Every structure is written in structure tokens, then in C-alpha cells.
Amino acid sequence: MHPGEMQAMKEAALGRTRRIERRVRLALIVAGGGLLAFNLARIIRSPIGDFHNHWQLGYNLLRGASLYPSVAECPSHYSNPYPPFWAMAHAPLTLFSAHVAQIIVFLPMYIGSLSLLMWTLFHLTRGHLPLDGQRQFWAFTIAMLVALQFLSRDMAECGVNIGLVALAWFAVYTWTRHRDWLGGASLGLAIALKMTAGLFVPYFLWKRQWKIASAAILFALIFTIAPVVVRGPTRFATDLSEWFDVLRAGNTGNPSIGVLGPEPIGNFALRPALARLITNGPVATSEPVTTNLLSLPPKVASAVIYFIKLSLLLAFACMIGRSVGDRRTLAVVYECAGVSLLMLLLSPITWGHHCVGTLPALYLICATAFYYGGLPRWMLIPAGYVLLTLIFNRAIVGRHLSFVMTGYSIVTWEILALLVLTLGCRSLAVRRQAPVPTPSR
């Protein structure tokens, strides 16, 4: 065959591939828009998720009612573990009914939060993992497809959990630009809304970044006490006391019992996941019975779980080291993705919609694989497990089997696998970007 004909055939095949890819990209964008439209239609039809409970907290704040009502005063499935500022953040929404407020907030909150997070991740990595537009699209798309079950669950909450992740990561971005006070304000706001974001403070302290750590603590305190303006000193003191009582309720000495009572299988935090494996604890009769490997007494199991969690933290701290050097290094971004994953593992409560916190790690792993043309072979094992968990989605295997697999905490082990992958990518990037020593003469 003539060389010119071969070249023409290659160009034609390449053109067909590009057209197919453009159609696939368009189909995915349309599908994403369709998912948003579907959930908006659900919300218009009737309120969904816990949004109405959060709206009620804002309403209670303004009318002087308790933010932490007893079981007799609130739905048995909902207990408020959030700081008082969470109610204050929802207070402006009480200008409308809970249903109308959810309709109004859904699209701006969800799209705005996701856009801010994607913008932040792009600007944190573009100098180290420069991808063309095509690969950049697929890095974000694959990350969102893997996290789709979590992203779709957060739609019922109007994207508030994506917003919390975006606030914490915007703080990281501003810190890398030496704007510590702005970063501290953003992180402090996230902490005042939900305490688990506070894990970034020990990270910055470990890295000797005193300014942003101090700023985050200061702003977290300012936002936390802000409701005193509405509630008054006496009522606010009662709010704090009741909140502490809710938090203390989870310290039963039995790892199978948390803030909400017997831990449901939908709590993907590390403590209840380990408890289901090593001790016999109370469970709801409607939930599947999982295999206990050790059947340890509750006190012994608590000590074992505490040791495992502490070991995980210490291992992470030792692997990342205390040195920062240049704040804009890619290693810092991987480390913060690891902190986001640890927040999910170490939190007392981690529901499916909280797991949108895996998105930064997923994006970094995808971007790293695209930039370096793949990942080391050993990383295929944890990556394979992460992809395998997608099969156990309710839409694929059915409600019953998905329910049974959830009882074995497959999502918890997925988060751990992502932590291993994130640290592996960090090691790969540090090794690839290290300067080559000049041979001595």
C-alpha cells in the first residue's frame, strides 16, 4: 500500500475516534444534566433528604426553641450532632417554607459548590500535572463517575457536603498562595459548620504552619459563638451544653453504639466498620448480620479500634513528614487529599453523602495516571478494589445484595484503598519530580 494511502487511513481513523469521543463526552454531559433535572423534579414533587430537618434547626434558632430536642420531640431517625452555627447558617432560609427553600437552593448550591471544588483542584495541580483539555475532562469525569453514588446522594442535601469539602480545599489553595488569613477564614467556617473539617488544623500544626492553623482556630471560634447574637448568652450557653451532651452520648465504651444509638450499616466510619468485624454489638433487626471475626468484649474492642485509628494517624504523619518547603509542591496536594480521606474514616458518623470527600483523591489519582501514562503495578490492586465496589451499586446488583455488601463495610475499605493510592501517587510524584543529582568530577 502506498505510504500516502496509509497516512490517509490513519487520519481517517483518528478523525472517527475523535468524533466518537466528542459524542461520548456530550452524552455524559447530557446525562449529568439529566441527573440534576431528575433530582430537581423529585424535590419539586416533595422534599427529600435531611434538608427539612436542617431548615427546622434554623427555624428553632430564630424562635428560641431547642436546637437539640429529645427523642420525644424530634424524628427518631434524626439526631442533631452539628454545632449551633449550623442552625444559624440555615436561618435565612426560613424566609420560605422548607419545601420552597430546598427548590430555590438546590441548583445554585450544588453546581456552585462542585464548580468551586473543581476550580480549586485544577489550579492546585495544573503547574505539576499539566493536562490538555481532553485529558483534563476525562480526569474529572472518571473521578465523578467513581464517586457518582456519593455525588447523587448529596443531591438530596442540596450539595451541602460538597460545599464543606470545597471550603476546606479553598483554604488549602489560598494557603499555597500565602494568604493564610483568608485560608484560615475559609477553613474556620467549614469547622464551625461541621467539626470533622478540623482535622486540617492538626495537619497544619504538624507541618509547622502556625499562621493558618491559628487563623482557622480563631475564625472557627468566632463563627461558633456567632449564634449568641440571636440566642442571647443564657440560651446560647444552654445550646452549647446540649450539644456537648449529644457528643458525649456516643462515648458509651461500646464501639457498636454511637451518637445515634446502635450503629447502622450505613455509617461508613472506621470505628463502626471495625466494630462489626471484631465484636458482637446491638444492630437493628432489619439489617444484615455480618461475620464477627473475633467476638471481642466491647471494652477490649474499643481499645483495639483506638489503637488501629491511632496507628493509622501516626503512620500517615510519618509518611508525609513535617517539612513543607515550597507550599505549591504537588506533595502537599496529595497530603491534603489524604487528610480529606482520614476525615471520613475518623469521623463518628460518615454517611454516603459525606463521602463526596473522596472526590479530591479520585481526581488526583486520575490526573496522575493520565500525566505519567499509568500507575505502578502494585497500585492496580487497590485501584481494582475501588472499581470493584462500583459493581455493588444498588442499581446493578439490586437492593438486597447491595444491602448485604454494605454490611461488610465495602465503602470503608474503598476509602482506605484510596488513601493507599493517594500516598502511592504522592511517592510517585515526589520521585519523578526530584532533581537529578549532578555527578561530581
Residue ranges and their predicted role:
Residues 2, 6-183, 207-334, 342-345, ...:
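Primarily membrane-embedded glycan-assembly and transfer machineries that use lipid-linked glycans
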Residues 80, 364-441:
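Aromatic-enriched
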Residues 95, 123, 204, 363-364, ...:
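Active-site catalytic microenvironments for nucleophilic, acid-base chemistry
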Residues 108-112, 159-167, 190-196, 217, ...:
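Membrane-embedded alpha-helical segments of multi-pass membrane proteins
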Residues 168-172, 196, 223-224, 362-368:
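Alpha-helical transmembrane segments and their membrane-interface exit regions
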Residues 181-204, 339-346:
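Membrane-interface alpha helices of multi-pass inner-membrane proteins
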Residues 188, 215-221, 335-341, 377-388:
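Central hydrophobic cores of alpha-helical transmembrane segments
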Residues 351-367:
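Hydrophobic/aromatic-rich transmembrane helices and adjacent perimembrane loops
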